[in-house]
Amino acid sequence: MRLWHEALIPQLPRPQLLGQHRECCALRGNGWGRKHATVDYVFTHSPYRLYAYHRLIMEEMAGRGYNVSPEWLDKNYRGKTCPPYQDLAEEKLNSPIYSEHDTAYYEECLANLREKGIELE
């Protein structure tokens, strides 16, 4: 489980893009705060950032013609079995959304994709 560097989102192959959507759904729901080495940094920020990152994924999916369940477009939605946020505070965000998504992380993501046989620029 990892969040791909947001600059890679438009280039992600279908399986990685759809997998990222599933991972974002899990993290936004009952997975919030559960330890996992590659995504622990996400929990040091507001859940709003994960929502904003997930929006990027969903926008890319929609642009490729995939259907996105509209519930996930609601910042407060956390899945069918997890209570929603009452009113998740919005934040002014920079790009990248996560400061951890720096040049070194970008290169790490590219290397991870290469290990899977996927070559991106």
Predicted regions and their residues:
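Expand to "…catalyze enediolate/carbanion chemistry for C-C bond making/breaking, isomerization
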Residues: M1-E121
